[in-house]
Amino acid sequence: MEEKNYDDGDTVTVDDDYQMGCTTPTRDDCRIPAYPPCPPPVRRKRSLLGFGKKREPPKKGYFQPPDLDLFFSVVAASQAAT
């Protein structure tokens, strides 16, 4: 045993074996529990409309207005002029 004196007049008795006797608990009930595995990812809902599937062309054909080609030729000409 050793006595330590402090500046404020306090005296403390310290056991020499005190520092040697401190260890981390190793019992199973003192251990940090392992985390359980993560749950699986949430499954995506099935698409009702079938997005991403290749569609067939419409049975009646695509709508083709008669002046559509004229519109694009005017736009192309105006862009070429600038």
Curated annotation (Swiss-Prot):
InterPro entries associated with the record: SMR
Subunit structure: Interacts with CDKA-1 and D-type cyclins.
Source organism of this protein record: Arabidopsis thaliana (Mouse-ear cress)
Function per UniProt: Probable cyclin-dependent protein kinase (CDK) inhibitor that functions as a repressor of mitosis in the endoreduplication cell cycle. Acts as a potent cell cycle inhibitor, regulating a hydroxyurea-dependent checkpoint in leaves. Essential to activate a high-light-dependent cell cycle checkpoint.
GO biological process per UniProt: DNA damage response; regulation of DNA endoreduplication
Acidic residues compositional bias, start-end: 8-18
Descriptive protein name: Cyclin-dependent protein kinase inhibitor SMR5
GO molecular function, one term: protein kinase inhibitor activity
Conditions for induction: Up-regulated by double-stranded DNA breaks-inducing treatments. Up-regulated by zeocin treatment. Up-regulated by DNA damage and oxidative stress. Directly regulated by the transcription factor SOG1. Down-regulated by iron excess treatment.
Chain intervals for the UniProt region annotation (Disordered): 1-26
Organs and tissues of expression: Expressed in columella cells in the roots and in root meristems after induction.
Keywords: Cell cycle, Protein kinase inhibitor
Lineage, uppermost ranks: Eukaryota, Viridiplantae, Streptophyta, Embryophyta, Tracheophyta
Keyword Metal-binding: no
